[in-house]
From Swiss-Prot:
It comes from Bos taurus. The gene is CSTB. The keyword Lipid biosynthesis does not apply. The lineage of its organism: Eukaryota, Metazoa, Chordata, Craniata, Vertebrata. This is an intracellular thiol proteinase inhibitor. Its main location: cytoplasm. This is Cystatin-B.
Length: 98
């Protein structure tokens, strides 16, 4: 993966789920609702001055959200942050840069 470009879509890992879990409350606050399910299914990543993660998350049986999470460089010691998201996505919607 080159700096600035996004990786290929990959199946979510335990690390991806942990990153998604860290921003779940931020998304719930922005959407003003609780998600009964919050399961990371797949992701792309992008190297910047840190790393962006684009994660497809299942939030209900047939409801999906695409989230963009920023992870700063380790020496900055900052928490991961939800920087953008897209709602009303389906299981087969392609995960793209947003």
């Amino acid at each position: 993966m080159m700096c600035g470009g996004t990786s290929a879509t990959q199946p979510a890992t335990a690390e991806t789920q942990a990153i998604a879990d860290k921003v779940k409350s931020q998304l719930e606050e922005k959407e003003n609702k609780k998600f009964p399910v919050f399961k990371a299914l797949e992701f792309k990543s992008q190297l910047v001055a840190g790393k962006n993660y684009f994660i497809k998350v299942q939030v209900d049986e047939d409801d999906f959200v695409h989230i963009r999470v920023f992870e700063s460089l380790p020496h900055e010691n900052k928490p991961v942050a939800l920087t953008s998201y897209q709602t009303n996505k389906g299981r087969h919607d392609e995960l793209t840069y947003f």
